[in-house]
Amino acid sequence: MKSMALSLAATVRCSIVVTLLAALYGCTPATTQSGSGGIVPPPGDDRAPLEWARSEPYLILVRRSCRTLTLYQYGQWVRTYDKVAFGRVPGAKVQEGDRRTPNGLYRIVGKREHPRWSRFMLIDYPNLSDRDDHRKAVEDGIAVTGPGGEIGIHGTDKERFNELGIDWTLGCVSLMNEDVEELYEFVPDGTLVLIED
């Protein structure tokens, strides 16, 4: 029990240091610099319009390194939520049970109330790109289970973890309950969700 408490204390200290460094130097997700090809604004400029998303009724942009989820309507900024938590293990999702949050472009494919997390919005992970990445990981001997599923955006029963920036989910994106309830009312099934580092 003592080692578990020490481990949690170390995790909290690490999380605080990362949060302070991000605040001092700005968060710079790798995909914003290269992978997304400039389709999203640089960190700290989430209020800038997204020209390519002007035909989308809603778009959710999740930035793991900034610990934010931003909602756009027809390419225009609506709201940015902070206190976001992710899968316990950093890095891109490879297989079921790896406790990682996937990166990529998805759609919300189902919404429901949830007894533990207030609201749950299911995304269409794994998409074709994820399945291809998983196939390659199996061929390379990296993945030994399927790609996984049941990834979504939900509330929290660990509010303090979200507040401290501690990642605790099995791969989902977690918001504070009042935030996920507000988002849930805004976005319909079919909403685009872009998750990046």
Regions found by a protein language model. Give the residues of each.
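Electropositive
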Residues: 79-107
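Bacterial N-terminal signal peptides that target proteins for export
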Residues: 3-16
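Exported/periplasmic cell-wall-interacting domains
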Residues: 48-52, 100-105, 110-197
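Short, low-complexity, disordered segments immediately C-terminal to signal peptides
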Residues: 31-45
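Short, solvent-exposed loop/turn elements at domain surfaces
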Residues: 69-72, 80, 91-94, 116-119, ...
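C-terminal motif of bacterial Sec signal peptides marking the signal peptidase cleavage site
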Residues: 25-26
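A structural motif detector for short, solvent-exposed N-terminal "entry" segments of globular domains
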Residues: 47-90
